[in-house]
Structures are given as structure tokens and as C-alpha cells.
């Protein structure tokens, strides 16, 4: 009976030891879980902040692209109008030179036909 009692005591000691080891492993696992939950929370906060920042950057970018497009449109319209002004100026200059030439010829013809009698 003493052998059975000793064996039972031995089993009991091993059971207690195994339970203590399991409790220690559980505590370590709980510590790791808490660390990872903290890390998860930190990462979620970073993602939220980055998402908000990305939204602000996208809004700013959209406004700036719209402004650039407006600049492009204004520049294109202004350049087209300026080219029309240049063409009109060239046409006006050609007409003016032609008319001045015609007037010069007409004046020269008038002076020849009058023969300088007015003097």
C-alpha cells in the first residue's frame, strides 16, 4: 500500500507540475496576445491617420489638377487669340502698304499730268 501511496504522491506531484507549466505557458501566451493586440491597435491608428492624410492629399491634388487644367485652357485660348491678332496685324500692314503705294502712284500721276503748273 505504501508503494501505491508513493506512486499516487508521485503522480500528484507530476500533475501539479504539469498544471503549473501549463499556467506559465498560458500566461506567456496572454502576454504575447496583449503585445500583438497593442501592436494591432497602433497599426490601426497609423492606417487611420495615413488614410486621412491620403484623403487630404487627394483633395489637394484634385484641386491643383483642376487649376492646372484651367491654366492650360486659358493659355491655349490666349495663344489662339494672339495668333489671330498677329494675322490681323499682318493683313492690316499689307493693306496699308498697298494703299500707300496706290496713293503714292496716284499722287505721282497727278503731279505728272498737272506738269507742275501749280508752282
From Swiss-Prot:
InterPro entries in alphabetical order: SSNA1_fam (IPR033362)
Record region (Important for localization to the centrosome): 2-32
UniProtKB keywords: Acetylation, Cell cycle, Cell division, Cell projection, Cilium, Coiled coil, Cytoplasm, Cytoskeleton, Flagellum, Neurogenesis, Nucleus
GO-annotated molecular function: identical protein binding; microtubule binding
Sites bearing N-acetylthreonine, chain numbering: 2
Coiled coil: 13-70
GO terms for cellular component: axon; axoneme; centriole; centrosome; ciliary basal body; midbody; motile cilium; nucleus
GO terms classed as biological process: axon arborization; axon extension; axonogenesis; cell division; intraciliary transport; microtubule cytoskeleton organization; microtubule nucleation; receptor clustering
Cellular compartment(s): Nucleus; Cytoplasm, Cytoskeleton, Microtubule organizing center, Centrosome; Cytoplasm, Cytoskeleton, Microtubule organizing center, Centrosome, Centriole; Midbody
UniProt function note: Microtubule-binding protein which stabilizes dynamic microtubules by slowing growth and shrinkage at both plus and minus ends and serves as a sensor of microtubule damage, protecting microtubules from the microtubule-severing enzyme SPAST. Induces microtubule branching which is mediated by the formation of long SSNA1 fibrils which guide microtubule protofilaments to split apart from the mother microtubule and form daughter microtubules. Plays a role in axon outgrowth and branching. Required for cell division.
Subunit structure comment from the entry: Self-associates to form fibrils. Also forms dimers as well as monomers. Interacts with SPAST.
Family membership: Belongs to the SSNA1 family.
Protein name as catalogued: Microtubule nucleation factor SSNA1
Amino acid at each position: 500500500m505504501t508503494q501505491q501511496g508513493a506512486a499516487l504522491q508521485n503522480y500528484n506531484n507530476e500533475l501539479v507540475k504539469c498544471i503549473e507549466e501549463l499556467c506559465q505557458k498560458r500566461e506567456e501566451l496572454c502576454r504575447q496576445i496583449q503585445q500583438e493586440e497593442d501592436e494591432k491597435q497602433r497599426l490601426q491608428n497609423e492606417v487611420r491617420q495615413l488614410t486621412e492624410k491620403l484623403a487630404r492629399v487627394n483633395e489637394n491634388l484634385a484641386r491643383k489638377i483642376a487649376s492646372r487644367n484651367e491654366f492650360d485652357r486659358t493659355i491655349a485660348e490666349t495663344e489662339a487669340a494672339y495668333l489671330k491678332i498677329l494675322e490681323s496685324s499682318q493683313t492690316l500692314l499689307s493693306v496699308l502698304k498697298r494703299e500707300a503705294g496706290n496713293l503714292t502712284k496716284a499722287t505721282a500721276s497727278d503731279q505728272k499730268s498737272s506738269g507742275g503748273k501749280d508752282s
